[in-house]
Amino acid sequence: MFDAIIVGGGPVGQFLALAAARAGRHILLLEAKPAGAGFNDDRTLALSWGSWLMLQRVGVTEQLEPAATPILRIHVSQRGGFGRSELTANDGGVSALGYVIGYGDVQRALAQRVTASDVRYHTSVDGIDQVDDGVVVHAAGENIAARCAIVAEGGGPLVATLGFSQREKDYGVHALVARVRTDRSHDGVAYERFAAVGPLALLPRSDSFALVWTLAPDDAQAVLGLDDQAFLERLQRAFGWRAGRFIAVAERGAFPLVLRQSEPRVRDRIALVGNAAQTLHPVAGQGLNLGLRDAWLAAAHLPKLDELDRARRLDRAATVHFTDALAGIFANDWPGLSWARGLGLAALDLLPAARRTFARTLTLGRL
């Protein structure tokens, strides 16, 4: 009998499989898509320093390094108000605040480490039944027994089918994503600029930036429809000139922003991790990193899922609150709040202890 069956072969599911195998667990990973399906996915991921260390422990960072761009400094500011702050790798006591990389690069590196006997592709899970000594997973016409099941697949109906409820908060805005280039080197600097509707982030990736731009839904669609020159001019007005002049744009898209949380995270012998457990606002880039921490602790506690729930509760709650509060504080025009935000950013820049605490939150995911 397997110690655990992992449902979902994205980055969190594959990382969990590797971490569990490293801990001596007998696991099976089930993935609905064919092998290699995500290798050409060029979406941008931001890995914290803490996530990088976990990936190092399962032996994939050597493969990731050629495609990863280190974040050496983060510049935080607000549009139309005073106050700014800069966080450096030195503030966090690390060699990099994080790394920016493509989804496909992470997926490929993890897949190359997962043992072929531990994974089945093209295998959809229809349901999971709990029995006296574990679970029975119904997949592709087969009934597979295990001591527990971990669901890391967040995009399909399985979570609801299993009886988990979901609470959703619609932020009422869209994230416009793209790759943009400027007329000068990024030097490993990431930018987070807050405006009334939400943040505009530039993440250094290779020789360009990954853009995440929060806009009202109608504005997002209008900006998507602009030609390249008009798009770059609109972006320049919104962001300013700190990163240089924007000269090229590619790979545009947009999607609505929501906070989605599944309840409970653990039900007897079934647990949810990653996007199956929660989907966060992208501010501060904490979603994937929280999912990897879920997976790391899950591997350590298998198959005792009640212990996993207790071990993860504080970090999950703190990270969800941190990202939700950060999005809310900066995404409105309440009278006087701009001054309060400015004072907060100025204090962060002037007080080394506060700056180090914030840097540790971003790099290690702990408040």
Predicted regions located by residue number:
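Conserved FAD-binding catalytic core of PHBH/FMO-like flavoproteins
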Residues: 55, 141-143, 149-245, 249-252
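Glycine-rich FAD pyrophosphate-binding loop
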Residues: 21-43
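Conserved Rossmann-like nucleotide-cofactor binding loop
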Residues: 12, 35, 156
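N-terminal Rossmann-like FAD-binding beta1-loop-alpha1 element of flavoenzymes
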Residues: 2-29
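Conserved N-terminal helical subregion
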Residues: 64-162, 168-175, 228
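N-terminal FAD cofactor-binding segment of flavoenzymes
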Residues: 41-79
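FAD/FMN-dependent oxidoreductases across multiple families
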Residues: 222-290, 294-303
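C-terminal helical "tail/cap" subdomain of flavin- and related membrane-associated enzymes
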Residues: 300-367
